[in-house]
Amino acid sequence: MTGRRTALIAVAVTVLACVLAWAFLARMYAIPSSSMEPGLQAGDRVVATLLTPDPFPVRRGDVVVFEDTKGWLPGGGHVIKRAVGLPGDTVSWTPGEQTLRVNGVPVDEPYLAPGETPAQEAFEVTVPAGRLWVLGDHRSASADSRAHRAGPGGGFVALDDVVGRARFVVWPLDRIGGAGADPDAFAAVPDAPAPEERT
């Protein structure tokens, strides 16, 4: 009887530990639209690891979940996009070019929806301190940083609003897998220059 009781206690402690880990380290989010296709599709459920107490900073190419504090969505809530520009980065696109440029370096984005160009209109932005520049992978169907340049925050997302990084698709079952983070696409991009180095 003692062995059985010990086993039940061990199972209960394990279940409790999993519930607590879920509550404090991860959350599930639903993908509401096609803006992150083809990697994430409308109706997918993704698990995001929370940034607090995550010791690792957001990287270029990470798929991030952030709280909508700037009115991007009619009812507020959470938004999921790809982090393309980190604080200090200059992100640009010129019509006719096949790639975005980050800090002057062309970035091949293999996660883009088929047939997509990196953007529909020319832009060049330098990301302020404590902010991110985010884009959807289905660029022509994504109201991302580009669409909100004239709004509060200038289209930039505050790092303080980022709640986590999408890690896994967990539903539907036939789509279980990674959530599409691709920091390797940005491997050749140099760090942003220090403010005094900019001209």
Positions of PLM-derived features:
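Soluble "head" domains of membrane/secretory-pathway proteins
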Residues: 8, 24-30, 38-199
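N-terminal Lys/Arg-rich, disordered targeting/topogenic segments
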Residues: 1-2
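Hydrophobic membrane-insertion alpha-helices, especially the h-region
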Residues: 6-24
